[in-house]
UniProtKB/Swiss-Prot annotation:
Taxonomic path: Eukaryota, Metazoa, Chordata, Craniata, Vertebrata
GO molecular function, a single term: ATP binding
The protein, known as: Probable ATP-dependent RNA helicase DDX52
Modified residues (N6-acetyllysine): K15
Gene: Ddx52
Annotated function: Required for efficient ribosome biogenesis. May control cell cycle progression by regulating translation of mRNAs that contain a terminal oligo pyrimidine (TOP) motif in their 5' UTRs, such as GTPBP4.
Gene3D superfamilies referenced in this protein's UniProt entry, alphabetically: P-loop containing nucleotide triphosphate hydrolases
Modified residues (Phosphoserine): S39
EC number: 3.6.4.13
Length: 598
């Protein structure tokens, strides 16, 4: 036994790298073996067809005598071999691989077990069943959702989209609509758009939650326009409800922008009396989509006959759904119920959108919506991570005004939004800041609609640096480039806090939020501090030790906020004098008008 044979036996099933260990290969004569003349003679002497006879000589040595080839005998042997049952291809490959390698004297030896496994792997790749393909597809979809923090609940879930071009490939989107989306600067869909658009295009009812500034308006606008396909004269076929007129105006503007050139008639109710004539029973019904607030729509529905027809509505979208479902004076639950009942079409589908999940909204949707799909982005009821959040202790109510003036002295980068608890406090803070030499204005429900529109327009144009507002304006309004949000009065809940600070840090931009708090705000601190901590911002250690409020206490605080001291620094004596002068002036004007009439 030479070194080559010994190496082969010891290294059976192993692989040897000749290039890397060339010196050892030369030493042990590892390589393709060159057969000598004796080996070749032995090979020639092999009897494959039984034509040779072995005869022993006197010494007992084996001698081989070759007979002349017999054609008939050879053909018979071949016929017998052809009649033998053929082995399966896989088994044949398994048995032939090691034999061939042994014969060639190659370097790579593979055991029959390894060859069998390799063969099975190859055949498995060729014969992927439909079940395996479906499993692989689901794995890819789940990986994509996890990557973008998309959480989905429901049955038979549609796959998300990765690009807007997929809408053309899979859903045949109107080419003009797709071009409008791209021209508006929306190159890649946001996570909520990736999942919400396919869900609505499949005609599924939806409950969606995503952080502020994540593109929820576009997430329901695109599927509405795609499913309506083209304008018709059947009346309104899509209805979008929002809690404030400012938000409704913003949605209306976005819908008009992306539907340009498609022919859709998109309307908004400005004055109910004019709308009754425009959309009433005698109208031409040349309209497709309506964007409105609940109260204006209820006014039209309560008329006899109704001032608007909603029987052909196919999509009912409720934006800021958790606010609209609230009970009490600030909520719209009763109005929303009337609107739902007015949409009697069997084709109607409903979609709820908000930045925060409310438990009662979720339960209502599960009970009343048909096969609803729940979509949420990131952690539920969490603040957007692009906002730097800070809690600032100011001691008392007077400390808030001092802290505000200190911020003005240090300098700030406008525009700035300042949130207060009530309309009265908004007026008081406005009168205090107007003398600080900054462009400041106030917006609240007691101002006329024209005044509110002018204020919002001036703030967007940069003419106003600081805008004081109440919590209702925190819902959905998209002010471009807001750099700072100041919570002058502490929010009554973590949900309200999330919506307030969501006015900055929108569409991936950075922002900052500063929240003032006093000793009186101690019961509310823990819930807001948890939101700040989840977003990765620092929170003082002593706040983490505060007790949590019970659910009953939280509801009570929301319905009846803390009574706070007046912001106004003017002495009461001068305020009373000013009121008396104002009343006297009004009385004198009345007397003059009476004299003129007489």
């Amino acid at each position: 036994m030479d070194s080559y044979d010994l190496f082969r036996r010891l290294g059976a099933g192993a692989k040897f790298d000749v290039k890397r260990f060339s010196a050892d290969a030369t030493r042990f004569q590892v390589g393709k073996r060159k057969f000598d003349s004796e080996s070749l003679e032995v090979l020639k002497g092999l009897d494959f067809f039984g034509n040779k006879k072995s005869v022993s000589d006197e010494c007992g040595a084996l001698q081989i005598h070759q007979e002349p080839p017999n054609e008939e005998k050879t053909q018979g042997v071949l016929l017998e071999r052809s009649k033998e049952p053929k082995k399966k291809k896989r088994k044949k490959m398994t048995s032939e691989v090691p034999a061939q390698e042994d014969f060639d004297g190659g370097i790579q030896w593979t055991s029959s077990v390894e060859a069998k496994l390799q063969d099975e792997k190859v055949s498995g790749e060729k014969k992927l069943t439909s079940g395996k393909l479906e499993h692989l597809r689901k794995e890819k979809v789940n990986f994509f959702r996890n990557k973008h923090k998309i959480h989905v609940q429901g049955t038979d879930l549609p796959d998300p989209i990765a690009t807007f071009q997929q809408l053309d490939q899979e859903y045949k989107i109107n080419s003009r609509l797709l071009q409008n989306i791209l021209d508006a600067g929306f190159q890649v869909p946001t996570p909520i758009q990736m999942q919400a658009i396919p869900v609505m295009l499949h005609g599924r009812e939806l409950l969606a939650s995503a952080p502020t500034g994540s593109g929820k308006t576009l997430a329901f606008s695109i599927p509405i326009l795609m499913q309506l396909k083209q304008p018709t004269n059947k009346g309104f076929r899509a209805l979008v409800i929002s809690p404030t007129r400012e938000l409704a105006s913003q949605i209306h503007r976005e819908l008009i922008k992306i539907s340009e050139g498609t022919g859709f008639r998109i309307h908004m109710i400005h004055k109910a009396a004019i709308a009754a004539k425009k959309f009433g029973p005698k109208s031409s019904k040349k309209f497709d989509i309506l964007v409105t607030t609940p109260n204006r729509l209820i006014y039209l529905l309560k008329q006899d006959p109704p001032g608007i027809d909603l029987t052909n509505v196919e999509w009912l979208v409720v934006d800021e759904s958790d606010k609209l479902f609230e009970d009490g004076k600030t909520g719209f639950r009763e109005q929303l119920a009337s609107i739902f009942l007015a949409c009697t079409s069997p084709k109607v589908r409903r979609a709820m959108f908000s930045a925060t999940f409310a438990y009662d909204v979720e339960q209502w949707c599960k009970l009343n919506l048909d096969n609803v799909v729940s979509v949420s982005i990131g952690a539920r009821n969490s603040a957007v991570e692009t906002v730097e959040q800070e809690l600032l202790f100011v001691g008392s109510e007077t400390g808030k005004l001092l802290a505000m003036r200190e911020l003005v002295k240090k300098g700030f980068k406008p525009p700035v939004l300042v949130f207060v608890q009530s309309i009265e406090r908004a007026k008081e803070l406005f009168h205090e800041l107007i003398y600080e030499g900054i462009n400041v204005d106030v917006i609240h429900a007691e101002r006329t609609q024209q005044q509110r529109d002018n204020t919002v327009h001036s703030f967007r144009a940069g003419k106003i640096w600081v805008l004081i507002c109440t919590a209702l304006l925190a819902r959905g309004i998209d002010f471009k480039g807001v750099n700072l949000v100041i919570n002058y009065d502490f929010p009554t809940s973590s949900v309200e806090y999330i919506h307030r600070i969501g006015r900055t840090g929108r569409a991936g931009n950075r922002g900052k939020a500063v929240t003032f708090f006093t000793e009186d705000d101690k019961p509310l601190l823990r819930s807001v501090a948890n939101v700040i901590q989840q977003a990765g911002c620092p929170v003082p250690e002593y706040i983490k030790g505060f007790q949590k409020l019970l659910s009953k206490q939280k509801k009570k605080m929301i319905k009846k906020p803390l009574e706070r001291e007046s912001i106004c620094t003017t002495p009461k004596y001068f305020l009373e004098q000013a009121k008396q002068k104002k009343v006297a002036g009004q009385n004198s004007k009345k007397k003059e008008t009476l004299k003129e009439k007489s």
